[in-house]
């Protein structure tokens, strides 16, 4: 971005697809995913890690340490850290909510409210708006779990599927970089029962891949609807797509 690898950059990964706008900004085809993985791996490997995205390099180091120490995934926290029983998200009105990225007025993607209660009645607080990675069907056997950490807990349905695909491509490049540092070899295929072929083939160079034919590209307009007004401040809901 700057041409100077000494300039630190705070983020270096995909934003989760929280809404239709995020999904539209995600990788859309298998070819897109393979191209991204090749680029991400190549830029870090080719520069010997001389990039400004320190968080990405730290993830590689962390993964290597976990492999060498035999770290058990049962101790792995969610990416956001909101599964920690000592962490609570509270808005300025004392409402206990899923996390800092949501409003107490919103409904989670699983149909449950993001409002879990109030700090005045802390004993009664109960959040049903999120799903821990250990309760999702494929996370526990995913090769990049230690890097991905389950992505976003409150996503579900199609938005979760898009986010999961993004997170896999984002992290499998780091997985390959860590593997190369550990062994001196660049992996090209990950064999795993139940792992889709486009995930087994890290860079898309080994197998033949057919794109999904049910995907159609439409011109879209992303809009946000005003859902409330609090103390003269307008509150907007999740973005929606108009075709």
PLM regions and their residue ranges:
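Radical SAM/AdoMet-radical enzyme domain recognition
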Residues: 1-16, 20
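Short acidic/histidine-rich active-site segments
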Residues: 9, 99, 151
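Short, surface-exposed amphipathic charged segments that create phosphate/polyanion-binding patches used
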Residues: 21-35
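C-terminal accessory region of radical SAM enzymes
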Residues: 32-71, 101-149
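Short, small/polar residue-rich loop motifs at catalytic or cofactor-binding pockets
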Residues: 80-84
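Radical SAM enzyme core and accessory elements
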Residues: 93, 107, 134-243
């Amino acid at each position: 971005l700057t041409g100077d690898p000494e300039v630190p950059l705070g983020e270096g990964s995909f934003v989760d697809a929280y809404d239709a706008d995020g999904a539209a900004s995600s990788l859309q085809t298998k070819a897109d995913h393979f191209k991204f993985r090749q680029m991400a791996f190549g830029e870090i490997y080719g520069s010997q890690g001389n990039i400004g995205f320190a968080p990405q390099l730290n993830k590689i180091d962390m993964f290597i340490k976990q492999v060498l120490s035999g770290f058990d995934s049962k101790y792995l926290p969610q990416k956001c850290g909101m599964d920690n029983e000592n962490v609570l998200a509270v808005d300025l009105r004392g409402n206990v909510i899923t996390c800092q990225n949501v409003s107490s007025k919103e409904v989670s993607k699983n149909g449950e409210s993001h409002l879990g209660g109030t700090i005045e009645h802390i004993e009664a607080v109960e959040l049903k708006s999120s799903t821990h990675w250990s309760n999702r069907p494929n996370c526990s056997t995913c090769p990049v779990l230690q890097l991905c950490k389950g992505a976003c807990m409150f996503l579900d349905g199609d938005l979760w599927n898009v986010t999961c695909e993004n997170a896999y491509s984002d992290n499998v490049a780091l997985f390959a970089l860590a593997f190369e540092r550990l062994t001196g070899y660049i992996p090209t295929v990950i064999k795993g029962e139940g792992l889709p072929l486009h995930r087994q083939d890290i860079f898309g160079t080994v197998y033949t891949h057919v794109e999904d034919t049910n995907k159609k590209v439409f011109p879209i307009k992303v809009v946000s609807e005003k859902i409330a007004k609090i103390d003269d401040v307008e509150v907007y809901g999740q973005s929606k797509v108009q075709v």
